[in-house]
From Swiss-Prot:
Chief subcellular location: membrane
Residues in MARVEL domain copies: 13-149, 154-298
Keyword Secreted on entry: no
Residues that span the membrane, as ranges: 45-65, 87-107, 124-144, 158-178, 191-211, 225-245, 273-293
One GO term describing the cellular component: membrane
Compartment(s) where it occurs, according to its Swiss-Prot or TrEMBL record: Membrane
Organism the protein comes from: Xenopus laevis (African clawed frog)
One protein family per Pfam: MARVEL
Protein name per Swiss-Prot or TrEMBL: Myeloid-associated differentiation marker-like protein 2
Membrane topology type: Multi-pass membrane protein
Amino acid sequence: MDSSGGAYLNVDAIWSKVGFVRLLQMLFGCTTFSLVLHRAGFSAAYGTFCVFVWAFCFALTILIVTCELTRLQSCLRSISWGNFTAAYAMLATLMTLTAAVIYPMYFTSLNCSSSDCSTKYFRLAVSVCAALLFVTYAVEVFLTRAKPGQPCSYMATASGLLKVVQAFVACVIFGALASESQYKKFVATQWCVAVYSFCFGVTMVVVILNITGRALSLCCPFERFVVIYTVLAILMYISAAVIWPVYFFDSKYGSAKRPSRCTWGQCPWDSQLAVTIFTHINLILYIADLIYTQRLRIVAQR
């Protein structure tokens, strides 16, 4: 017989603000991919990615709600539940935002493709539900974020949330690199790929250490390790932010203008531009991470 005390079910997992938002996530998530599979349809890698995002987020949200409702998360000794849910909410926000942009861009049209307009209406409904799904995950991030004067998990802080965004942006960069980017053309651009890979790897280690609750078991202070790594990542990203555009958009090596005969979706110039943009975005994210961490340290010492 269970002697742990307290009710078997945690009603707050549903009736709290966060619980209600998660119920909406399950509703919109299930509705979105059900509409796609029923009539709206999808094709190619873009459509498959969108359906995967909606199904993955729906399944994992159900798992989180079930664990919190039945208090099963207390049995997961190897996981820091607060860090896990905060990191997942941020990741789901980014993934659903991407899907909410991609699906309407490639599959939704205001014109009917045939005499039957039902497919158009289904795809419009999918686009609306996908946008609402993104909003619900963004609201969860807002509700569970770290608040001044309250104890919180590291992944719920601005620094922790930025780590998830940095890793996600790196994945976008890897996707662009794999799509006709021609990064092997120069040794210098291969260095840029090494920068992206190294920073992504260390960022993932930081996230995993927090989710598994092993961040405090390091031989050196975790916060100091993160600050040192962030400074190194900024320096490395600065080099990539300079090198990549020079070797692909300077007239000596490449072209500053998009080739007129470049096919949409198969154009190396487009991939190179995407890498450039997201490299600068990640550089800004790492700088913001360092500024926030330093400001938090100064406030804590007062």
